[in-house]
């Protein structure tokens, strides 16, 4: 088109020619049409246009195409911002940054304008208001979804059916209840990872109980940090742990057998002070707490009279606590200061054994050693104790340690830093509570009274796994719970060491 003089475009020109008037009218129409198109383009980024024809098939088209989560929400205790953007009522959700072949032409131009900066992006940010600081895929949800309930969260890696169920709930129509949606997902073989309003409190309780269940299932000695990370990343079971009653047929065999992995053996210790007025020591009885409320006797122990050091005899017969009886199963012996204890079975002392006895394999076996840190008058705070037990082999059996001299004992190996075939445990450090002005530990309701004898035994690499816990519930009643790799005899002897008086630890 050749340029014309500016005077030709003036409506009140002196030249009144029909041809030029027609050309002028055509130019005016073209200019008005061009301005209309430009105005429309400038207005399009300000509003997401809804397409009624594309809506019914948009949900089906997204099934095989969108694998990323619709909404990625990070929740914290202090609250977090949910990025929601207002849009037209007819559009359920639009994912930015994704190519959708079924979208109309106006929506394509909207996406192109959204990716570019400038006036359009600034105007949209001003209009939407809440959408800021977002990286990665985000979702534009209509105002109706906020009134219906919280945004459903789909984790990365879920199947398309689970994502389709989430999109159906977030789209138009009536939102199904949590039970119906969970049942639909279970029929399709999908584990529910969605949060429902009516199940929020139950899920928090299940997560805490499942984390405790995962922490109770530990391989062999529970000494590697890798197992801790694997247990933390493993999916938590949906059903709570069912109570399991441990069968006790042979008392001696049960007392020496390590606790099954993943099962906490809950016991109760009662102290009988009969005969103390005649110079006798109290007797301690260990019972197994069953889920039906019944109690099963396991072990009995009492301190021997006329012994140079503390010497507790342990028996499977509550009426026969003599060393020469058939029910004698082991003993606990301390040093002169009462700070170090060793647990033996009913084998023969190597210093009193003959040469034939040494070769026959009937030497006594060391089952545990307990070492209390000296703390005169309690100036160093609460008690600190270390527990050394034999390690476990590949088939979860206890390694046999039968020392023939003082250099092969558990205490000697531990003091010489020879940690081969042994496991070192320690008590969990209690936390000072300003309200009660005392040191406290979380016994999960199993201990109700404060006492210097209360303790929890853990491994240094896994402080959340409680190997054993002991505490007072009444004047002469105590609870004792133990887990793998301890056995009943080891745990009972460790508890007896806590009862004994300690000259350097009081």
UniProtKB/Swiss-Prot annotation:
Record InterPro entries: Tubby-like_C, Tubby_C, Tubby_C_CS, Tubby_N
Annotated Gene Ontology cellular component terms: cilium; cytoplasm; cytosol; extracellular region; nucleus; plasma membrane
Renumbered residue ranges of the record's region Disordered: 36-244
Taxonomy, superkingdom: Eukaryota
Compartment(s) where it occurs, according to its Swiss-Prot or TrEMBL record: Cytoplasm; Nucleus; Secreted; Cell membrane
Transmembrane segments annotated in the record for this chain: none
Keywords: Cell membrane, Cytoplasm, Membrane, Nucleus, Obesity, Phagocytosis, Secreted, Sensory transduction
Membrane topology listed for this record: Peripheral membrane protein
Biased composition (Acidic residues): 196-206
A single GO molecular function term of this UniProt record: protein-containing complex binding
Family listed: Belongs to the TUB family.
Primary role: Functions in signal transduction from heterotrimeric G protein-coupled receptors. Binds to membranes containing phosphatidylinositol 4,5-bisphosphate. Can bind DNA (in vitro). May contribute to the regulation of transcription in the nucleus. Could be involved in the hypothalamic regulation of body weight. Contribute to stimulation of phagocytosis of apoptotic retinal pigment epithelium (RPE) cells and macrophages.
Disease with which this protein is associated in UniProt: Retinal dystrophy and obesity: A disease characterized by obesity, night blindness, decreased visual acuity, and electrophysiological features of a rod cone dystrophy.
Protein's recorded name: Tubby protein homolog
Organism: Homo sapiens (Human)
